[in-house]
Amino acid sequence: MKPKSKVLIIAGSDSSGGAGIQADIKTITSLGSYAMTAVTAITIQNTTGVKSIVSIEPKKILDQIIFTCKDIKPDAIKIGMLHSSNVINFVINSIDRIKVKKIILDPVMIAKGGAKLINKRAIKTLQKNLIKKITLITPNIPEAEILTNTRIKNIDDMIFAANILLKFGAKNVLVKGGHLKNKIIPDVFVSKKEIKIFRNKKITTKNTHGTGCTLSSAITTFFSCGKPLKKSCELAIKYVNHSIRSNLNYGKGHGPVNHLNSIKIKKIFR
């Protein structure tokens, strides 16, 4: 089978394979597209937490992006972990040069086990310089609270935070509601033209490592294949929900989701 599209991932590596670039590659491949990578950091972690983070020299990150895209131009880009202000600025430089229009940003800030993956200066740079460059930003509730300096307890708060991100220059926002203690989980899509709330039953499991990475990569994949952005979000949420339901009970902590689940449910993604 020939890949449907080409996706460049700019993100950190997760040695346990559940999140980061490893989750991105699995997601993109399982949905039928071709994945390329630019590694921004190496995280030494397992399902119980992050032991340490090894930074990649920003110039080497830029080189990965430019050299790869010079040969194979991606249809879309997914951006994940950018742990420093310097890294963010080099990534902005690179995406300005390669001129890809479809860019999804997952503002990775805190690992599932609670470890911080980005510093305060980088958050300011992301707010001021990067958000306006991308097509969609996909924060979870803790990330949206940090980016907007607000408290989020319900759907109205999620919409309010999304509108702040629009004022920062975001074109579209998907605030993920998985951290709410609701039986029905809302994911809120907000643009300057509309608000759409996706509602799904909460799945009770500790095995949710990599759900944010998986969702943003799934959105990027559907979007890269020509699906409208809002529809891409809807399909990606379905994919992640099925991945969680068929989760892998690996490790002693937060186990990974099952990226191979799409093989069984391809009819959903038409």
Task: Give residue ranges: language-model regions.
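Conserved N-terminal subdomain of the carbohydrate kinase-like
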Residues: K2-I9, T29-K112, K116, K266
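Charged C-terminal helix
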Residues: K4, S55, K230-R270
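Short pre-catalytic strand/loop immediately N-terminal to key active-site residues, enriched for Gly-Thr
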Residues: I10-S16, I195-H209
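Short, small-residue alpha-helix embedded
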Residues: Q22-I25, I146, T205-L229
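Phosphate-handling active-site elements
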Residues: L31-M36, F222-A236
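Conserved phosphate/ATP/ADP-binding segment of small-molecule kinases
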Residues: K120-I195
